[in-house]
């Protein structure tokens, strides 16, 4: 009888090559099939090779929850009557109660979630279900913000770190800046003293690109500029923006394009023009090599009879179709979270919901690639505290 060859009979190199081409979400369901595959799917070289084999997914943080959107970006844009469908609220991060998630930050398939009052932090892989809980700094404040990044490693797991930052006025009415780093390998927080006297402010949600975080920042003397934090050197560096502005009321938002580029959306609130503009960078290998396109997209909101102030909090860009999917918080007779598609001659609202909670609960729309990346685990302490790290239900 002729023997049928199965994948386990193949040489390891060929087996690995075949599996690396399988969509990531399918592999996540197979990781417990056998010990060999379990080890392979945790190999950083295999994870890097497989990254990008699945379609991008959309996720919305709104009303203190995180929601999965059914379609990807192209599915929404190609629909004859586009609208967003939410399959489920991602409540699988709970331990004994539903968590109030106040902020999220995306970094290469991992989501950093901040809970109410920043009393707990959790890093979560929505593809594999793995989580790691992080104890906040002893200096933490309820208005802290956090970014997740890493130091790139070609041969081993990335060394992940968390940047904590906050700005506040002390008893002498002086502005104080605080920056701290949490290192996953040392499981500890430490202060970045060099930056406690900086006078610039951050004006948008940070965006992670290739392990580093980019912001739009500004100060009175120089106006707006782009700022990036290098998790390897643990230093901030200034980069140029494609426009000049000194008005802190302007809308300025960053987005990641295809995992290789940055885009910036700008709207001058004080000008007589009701125009939104978007620029895109070149492919970025090193931040110092960043350059901006002359111009990518300009949209005149007056054409669509829209209000002059649109509080865009996040956006996604489709370079091929030259359209943007914008998420904003619209304040008229009632406070609403909106998502709409906009282009030179296009405006289509695809989602609107009344916003709940405090004024700081800004919605955030993100696009992410499912990843098998493994979150560094804590040893050996966690073995005595199994409830601190657990697998949660995968997104299906």
Swiss-Prot record:
Task: Output the PANTHER family linked to this UniProt entry.
Answer: BNACNNG10540D PROTEIN, F-BOX PROTEIN CPR30-LIKE
Q: Membrane-spanning regions, if any?
A: none
UniProt keywords, alphabetically: Kelch repeat, Repeat
Q: Name one Pfam family in it.
A: F-box
Q: Does the keyword Magnesium apply?
A: no
Note the InterPro entries from the entry.
F-box-assoc_dom_typ1, F-box-assoc_interact_dom, F-box-like_dom_sf, F-box_dom, Gal_Oxase/kelch_b-propeller, Kelch-typ_b-propeller, SCF_F-box_component
Locate the F-box domain: which residues?
A: 4-50
Kelch repeat positions? 163-209, 253-299, 338-386
**How is this protein named in the record?**
Putative F-box/kelch-repeat protein At3g17540
Q: Which organism is it from?
A: Arabidopsis thaliana (Mouse-ear cress)
């Amino acid at each position: 009888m002729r023997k049928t060859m199965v994948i386990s009979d193949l040489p390891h190199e060929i087996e690995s090559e075949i599996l690396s081409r399988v969509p990531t979400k399918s592999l996540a369901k197979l990781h417990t099939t056998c010990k060999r595959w379990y080890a392979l799917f945790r190999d950083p070289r295999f994870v890097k090779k497989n990254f990008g084999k699945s379609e991008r997914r959309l996720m919305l943080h709104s009303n203190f929850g995180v929601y999965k959107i059914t379609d990807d970006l192209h599915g929404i844009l190609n629909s004859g009557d586009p609208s967003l469908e939410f399959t489920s609220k991602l409540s699988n991060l709970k331990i004994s109660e539903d968590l109030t998630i106040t902020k999220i930050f995306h970094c290469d398939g991992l989501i950093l979630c901040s809970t109410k009052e920043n009393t707990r932090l959790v890093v979560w892989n929505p593809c594999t279900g793995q989580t790691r809980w992080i104890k906040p700094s002893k200096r933490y404040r309820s208005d802290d913000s956090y970014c997740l990044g890493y130091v790139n490693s070609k041969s081993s797991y990335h060394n992940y770190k968390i940047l904590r930052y906050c700005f506040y006025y002390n008893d002498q009415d002086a502005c104080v800046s605080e920056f701290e780093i949490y290192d996953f390998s040392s499981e500890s927080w430490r202060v970045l003293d060099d930056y406690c006297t900086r006078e610039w402010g951050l004006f948008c949600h940070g965006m992670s690109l290739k392990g580093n975080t980019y912001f739009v920042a500004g100060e009175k003397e120089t106006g707006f500029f782009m700022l990036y934090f290098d998790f390897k050197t643990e230093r901030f560096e200034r980069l140029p923006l494609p426009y000049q502005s000194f008005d802190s009321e302007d809308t300025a938002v960053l987005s990641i394009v295809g995992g290789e580029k940055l885009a910036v959306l700008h709207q001058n609130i004080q000008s007589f023009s009701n125009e939104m503009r978007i620029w895109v960078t070149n492919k970025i290998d090193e931040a110092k090599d960043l350059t901006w396109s002359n111009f990518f997209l300009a949209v005149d909101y007056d054409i669509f009879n829209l209000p002059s102030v649109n509080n865009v909090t996040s956006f996604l860009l489709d370079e091929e179709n030259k359209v943007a999917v914008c998420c904003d918080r619209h304040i008229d007779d009632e406070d609403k979270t909106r998502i709409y598609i906009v282009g030179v001659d296009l405006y289509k609202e695809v989602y609107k919901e009344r916003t709940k909670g405090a004024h700081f609960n800004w919605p955030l729309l993100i696009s992410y690639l499912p990843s098998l990346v493994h979150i560094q685990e804590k040893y050996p302490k966690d073995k005595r505290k199994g409830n601190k790290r657990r697998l949660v239900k995968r997104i299906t």
